């Protein structure tokens, strides 16, 4: 069987893991990036495209294959084109529209009894410091902090002038929770009927993470463009509540977006000084922070006692499904 993915985000990890699990591998790659990916011997097949429509054709042109989505898929290819993919997709493709809509994303978290930041529908209602986010997986680009409603309205006006948004309804305006970011990575296994923690990361963002190096008298507006990731482990006392969140999330998605979460997902959180975990967003697919753990994380070793990246864990789940003749339970 062929496992393939789009060249970006976590594609190297996905295909490296697939090869470790004995699969033939394939990458759908823009011709401008082909040379880079040719450097890696674990990629068996190259499906080179020059347009997004051609990328979908390349995916659909494969046989006996499973396509593995990642966090850049919708952003690069677009929801309408992704809906035309006929090749089986690992995970729940019905979650894609929910991930692309910030209001729906927050609704799933709230239905899961997960603690979330206060949300403001209208800039006029802002009465505290907030962070304003653009829709979709833009890697933090365009996000800004507003200390009051005047700053929020001014920031929105700048986004409109730059053509980044058409109307305010596209944005999510959230209370800015004071604490440290921790991104809790999970994997739900339909084959083993369990939620596994696969790692934790912190996003390394420019320029907010560089401002601390400046003298205090130099003022600069923070931006939140993700440039990399840093590994983390959490105090063990935090983990039970985070696991409860993850299990609640899986149960909710089964009811609201059947067949529910399958495979990797991430609860993107702030941990406060009282050790409360506040989840401000989720990712329903593999996140780039898993690239830190190509040989496994401190948590994946506790389950498998062998090197187990999330890419390899995806391959392992597909292998288990094939062995049990239940591939339809991990693909949609």
Swiss-Prot record:
Catalyzes the ATP- and formate-dependent formylation of 5-aminoimidazole-4-carboxamide-1-beta-d-ribofuranosyl 5'-monophosphate (AICAR) to 5-formaminoimidazole-4-carboxamide-1-beta-d-ribofuranosyl 5'-monophosphate (FAICAR) in the absence of folates. 5-amino-1-(5-phospho-beta-D-ribosyl)imidazole-4-carboxamide binds at residues 9, 72, 229. ATP binds at residues 123-183, 205. Mg(2+) binds at residues 268, 281. Residues 93-323 form the ATP-grasp domain. Pathway: Purine metabolism; IMP biosynthesis via de novo pathway; 5-formamido-1-(5-phospho-D-ribosyl)imidazole-4-carboxamide from 5-amino-1-(5-phospho-D-ribosyl)imidazole-4-carboxamide (formate route): step 1/1. Binds 1 Mg(2+) or Mn(2+) ion per subunit. It catalyses: 5-amino-1-(5-phospho-beta-D-ribosyl)imidazole-4-carboxamide + formate + ATP = 5-formamido-1-(5-phospho-D-ribosyl)imidazole-4-carboxamide + ADP + phosphate. Its cofactor is Mg(2+); Mn(2+). It comes from Metallosphaera sedula (strain ATCC 51363 / DSM 5348 / JCM 9185 / NBRC 15509 / TH2). This is 5-formaminoimidazole-4-carboxamide-1-(beta)-D-ribofuranosyl 5'-monophosphate synthetase. SUPFAM superfamilies: Glutathione synthetase ATP-binding domain-like, PreATP-grasp domain. Its EC number is 6.3.4.23.
């Amino acid at each position: 069987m062929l496992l393939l993915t789009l060249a970006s985000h976590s594609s190297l990890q996905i295909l490296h893991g697939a090869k470790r699990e004995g699969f033939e591998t394939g990458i759908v790659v823009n011709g401008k990036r082909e040379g880079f990916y040719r450097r890696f011997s674990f990629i068996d097949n190259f499906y080179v495209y020059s347009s997004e429509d051609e990328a979908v054709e390349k995916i659909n042109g494969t046989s006996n294959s499973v396509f593995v989505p990642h966090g850049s898929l919708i952003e690069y290819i677009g929801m309408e084109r992704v809906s035309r993919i006929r090749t089986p997709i690992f995970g729940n493709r019905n979650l894609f529209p929910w991930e692309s809509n910030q209001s729906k994303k927050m609704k799933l978290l709230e239905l899961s009894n997960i603690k979330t930041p206060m949300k403001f529908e209208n800039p006029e209602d802002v009465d505290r410091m907030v962070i304003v986010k653009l829709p979709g997986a833009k890697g933090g680009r365009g996000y800004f902090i507003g200390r009051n409603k005047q700053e929020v309205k001014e920031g929105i006006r700048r986004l409109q002038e730059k053509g980044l948004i058409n109307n305010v309804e596209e944005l999510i305006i959230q209370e800015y929770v004071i604490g440290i970011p921790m991104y809790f990575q999970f994997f739900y296994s339909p084959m083993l009927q369990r939620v596994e923690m696969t790692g934790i990361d912190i996003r390394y963002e420019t320029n907010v993470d560089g401002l601390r190096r400046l003298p205090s008298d130099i003022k600069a507006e923070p931006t939140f463009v993700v440039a990399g990731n840093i590994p983390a482990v959490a105090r063990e006392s935090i983990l039970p509540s985070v696991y409860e969140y993850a299990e609640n999330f899986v149960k909710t998605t089964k009811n609201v977006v059947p067949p529910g979460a399958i495979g990797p997902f991430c609860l993107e959180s702030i941990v406060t000084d009282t050790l409360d975990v506040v989840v401000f967003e989720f990712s329903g697919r593999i996140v780039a922070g898993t690239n830190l753990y190509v040989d496994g994380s401190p948590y994946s070793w506790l389950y498998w006692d062998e090197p187990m990246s999330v890419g390899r864990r995806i391959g392992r789940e597909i292998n288990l499904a094939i062995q049990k003749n239940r591939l339809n339970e991990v693909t949609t």
